[in-house]
Regions:
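Flexible, low-complexity inter-domain linkers and amphipathic docking helices that mediate domain-domain
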Residues: 1-95
Length: 95
């Protein structure tokens, strides 16, 4: 999946908001699973959505490209929900 397939609305800003990051991840997972975005619960662990290690690495890589920030490809194991990953990203981007 290409990172640019999901619209980057913060191109003129320095950093995306928590909502923008969370929405990007939700949209990404929804597109990957071919479901509506409103079916994705941000508190459900990624593995419950059936994301295997290659899908997790793909998500991390596309998110890295979208944010234009270097990210650890294993971060989805440390932050196993959309909610926890979003919180982590907001904290790390503001450093």
């Amino acid at each position: 999946m290409e990172a640019n397939t999901i619209k980057n609305d913060f191109q003129t800003k320095e950093q995306p908001s928590k909502l923008e990051i969370q929405t990007w991840i939700v949209d990404y997972i929804a597109e990957l699973l071919e479901v509506e975005a409103n079916k994705i619960d941000v508190t459900i662990p990624f593995d419950r959505y059936g994301l295997d290690s290659s899908a997790a690495v793909g998500l991390a890589g596309d998110l890295e490209e979208w944010l234009d920030e270097e990210l650890d490809p294993t971060m989805l194991y440390d932050y196993p929900t959309i909610e926890s990953l979003t919180e982590h990203l907001i904290e790390s981007l503001s450093d």
